[in-house]
Swiss-Prot record:
It comes from Pediococcus pentosaceus (strain ATCC 25745 / CCUG 21536 / LMG 10740 / 183-1w). The gene is groES. One of its GO terms (molecular function) is ATP binding. Heptamer of 7 subunits arranged in a ring. Interacts with the chaperonin GroEL. Belongs to the GroES chaperonin family. One of its GO terms (cellular component) is cytoplasm. Its main location: cytoplasm. PROSITE patterns: CHAPERONINS_CPN10. This is Co-chaperonin GroES. Keywords: Chaperone, Cytoplasm.
Length: 94
């Protein structure tokens, strides 16, 4: 299992949209990169200069929206994940 460090989270990104709301099927090069994902692992939080740790605002299982160009894609056990800093998370989907 992957364990993120510091203020990072590991996301299982939602698949790219294959068709538009109107039902038009998109070519593979026209698909938009999804900006939502499900958190599967959370780091311990940000460590301040005085040694205190600020806990994360999100938890495992949350579905979140993240910045379009945020994160680093990693592969682990034949699956792709996204490692993102908490500051690059925009919202939690409720």
């Amino acid at each position: 299992m992957l364990k993120p460090l510091g203020d990072r989270v590991i996301l299982e990104a939602k698949d790219e949209e294959e068709q538009t709301v109107g039902g038009i099927v998109l070519a593979s090069n026209a698909k938009e990169k999804s900006q939502t994902g499900k958190i599967i692992a959370v780091g311990n939080g940000t460590v301040l200069d005085n040694g205190q740790t600020v806990p994360m605002n999100v938890k495992v299982g949350d579905t979140v929206v993240y910045d379009k160009y945020a994160g680093t894609e990693v592969s682990y056990e034949d699956k792709k994940y996204l490692v993102v800093h908490e500051k690059d998370l925009v919202a939690v989907v409720e």
